[in-house]
Amino acid sequence: MKLTKILILLLAFWLEPLSASPYFSFKKYQVEDGLSHNTVWCAIQDSYGFIWLGTSDGLNRYDGRGNKVYRNVLNDKFSLENNFVEALIEEDQNIWVGTNSGLYIYDRATDRFSYFDKTTQYGVYVSSEIKKIVKTENGLLWIATLGQGLFIYDPKTEVLTQNSIQTSFVWDVCQSYDKKKVYVSSLQEGLLCFDENGKFLQSYRVSSDVNSSDSYKINCVLDVEGEVWLGAGNNLLGRLNRQTGTVENYMAPSLNFGAVRSLLKYTENELLVGTDNGLYLFNRESKTFLRADNPADPRSLSDQTINGMMWDAEGALWVLTNLGGINYMSKQTKRFDYYSPAYLSGIAGAGEVVGPFCENKDGNIWIGTQSGLYFFNTVTRELSEYHIGGVKSQKYDIRSLMLDGDCLWIGTYAEGIRVLNLRTGSIKEYTHSRGIPNTICSNDVLCIYKDRKGEIFVGTSWGLCRYNPDADNFMTITSIGSMISVGDIYEDMYNNLWIATTNSGVFSYNTLSGHWKHFQHEREDSTTITSNSVITVFEDNKGVMWFGTNGGGLCSFDPKTEAFIEFDSALPNKVIYSIEQDQTGDFWISSNAGIFKINPISKAHFRQFTINDGLQGNQFMARSSLKSSEGKLYFGGINGFNVFQPERFVDNSYIPPVYVTDIRLSYLNDEQEVKKLLQLGKPIYMADKITLSYENNSFTIRFVALSYEDPARNRYSYMLKGVDKEWITNSENNSASYTNLPPGEYEFEVRGSNNDHQWNEKTTTLRVVITPPWWRSSFAYFIYILLLMGWIVWIAWRWNLRVKHKYKHRMEKYQIAKEQEVYKSKIGFFINLVHEIRTPLSLIRLPLEKLQEIEHEGKEAKYLSVIDKNVNYLLGITNQLLDFQKMENGALQLNLVSCDIKEIVNDVYSCLLY
């Protein structure tokens, strides 16, 4: 007992306390990220899941991956007329927007703004600066203004009433926990109390002194389970005592946080207090303040002046700042407690790079950094700097720690070993000296390890040595060579001492038999260790040895075959700094890409945690980890260290709604032009169908799952029916592009998950219609059908005409043939008749020739001459008739001769003379 008291006194002397709690870490959303202005006055999450932010330059609708800004548009009467937005509320799915010159209503169905033109019975408009809009349980809207007092609007009856009797300057409105009262903070009269229908009940004054008549301006009011808390100026937080009707003041002049601007319930016993000078936690039981942010920490608040705070549906905190935009803290961020000596001391470079951890008998942690030694009290969570030897200026770059009884062995870079007696505070030094034998191998001490026999081994950048307590010196172990850098040492359950080197693989030394083995990487042999640069050695709860390497990833050792087995070649990073195993058997592995959680047996449930989850950074330090006696894991990196309880991790169970939020065309990026082209009178996330012309058949569909814890890790699965044959899954990209789609009707379906892969199985659907060109339109096809029918009729007419013509031609041929047949029969008959005539003429000619041979005179000779002439003439005619037949048959050959026409006439005449 006496020794413990002495130790506490010594620690109190050498320890310099820095902090008693981890600070909040935030993700920022600012102008550089798409926010319209870094001064954010108000925020709400609507029924769809979107976050609406009111700023000094416009209204923002944020979905985690993108932001749409509503501002005043010149000559557009449906745009927001005033860009200075200070109050927001959702009413009947529409957004009521309070500005510094009146009230506007955003109609979601038409995507338009309209001025709230309702008047009181006296014709008064809401035209002043609006500070707050609150909807009470009975459906009334309470509108706080600066200059016109308090307005109450009933949406059912559309009646607007004004109350400016008690005060004209109202800052905040809050409904009581029992829903029967409404508290109103005013500039002149302090806190006012109304019933739920707007009837004034009483007022309360707030001051720093109960005997003072001065009243502070109340900036904010919050009712927590019946306790009414007030935030005012001059470091004042007040609580209304409803029994006495007075306000109890809790001032913190030592903190100097200025005015309290915003209040929010944090836990059952704690309030979040947003001030002019940072964020504080107020314990309602102990009535104490605790700083929740650190101005020296770049991951803390981006601005110390807080305008407001809000919880979203996932339980994440949104902090609205005056000049730093939005600061977001998710539940995932709260999984990891974060500490940094640099941020705690406010001195840049003061121990921000954290190295080894060492737990003492009381469960507290010693921490080595590049700038000295620190002590972490696990009960009070107080981190303190320990001045070795009581000298503040003495700073060591500490690479290893090992507790041996009351002595803490400290391995440093370039300065050897320091052994700190925790009981007396004395320091003993061990350094390397060339001229003195049996000193440590090198002053660059990388690891110190004590085996089961109690022997202490020291790994340095120039080999391995063993401590000899009897001679108080060191003996170099030559079995591994002096040119080898030893980074880690571990003794397994089989009494094998594993020595990890940075340039020669790993050695194993059996402490019972004294037998050495050397394992190195060989390119041609996959059963060898994956890299010769081994950073850390770890034995799991089943006795399996694991090795984390620099560039070779993680591998395990099979003692039966003496083969090394690579764990998983698909690890995001091949540099393994440290390995710890939790109570459930899962591995937690630090790397250059954050911390991995892996099940070593099933290799399932792989998780990667990064700076976005609250880690000190993505890069950690070699062998900087510890599993404490209470099961907490400690990991150190280049910006401090994290502490967490793995068993308390709870995945994000929020099922996010999924919406299609935007359509981008290949040649048109202007949102307003796209909106006109689509001819949508409402936001696209409310549309179930869009129509595109054939010229716009290449487009990109943007969609989003409204989970804000880590939007970049939300996953999506989508499909365009008619184009995609199967679902495109496991994509973190929240857009899908399609090119040169033929005209037709398609159906786009998308599903989404949050960052912890909690999927929304409900499919969001959008029909996409691509209209054809005019020559492929319905009217064009109607014309084409008419033309086709006309062409068919014309073809039929032409065919009928051709058939008729052909029939007529056949009939004509038949008629001609028939006529020719009749003609031939007539000609035949005529020829026969001619033959009948010719035969007698021939018979007449023969006796006539005989008679002419006898000489006759006188008339007989003349008569015979006439008879002969006519007979010859008749024979000539018959011959000509026969020649006509030949001519008809084409067998006649004309024999043309010249003759005297006069003779022919005389002959004819002479024939007719008688």
Where do the PLM segments sit?
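Residue-level detector of Asp-centered blade-edge/turn motifs that repeat once per structural unit
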Residues: 45-48, 89-93, 135-138, 175-179, ...
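Conserved beta-propeller blade signature
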Residues: 50-52, 94-96, 141-142, 181-183, ...
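Helix-loop junction within the histidine kinase core
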Residues: 885-896
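A conserved beta-strand-to-alpha-helix junction within the catalytic ATP-binding
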Residues: 895-910
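Conserved small/polar residues in nucleotide/adenosyl-binding loops
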Residues: 914
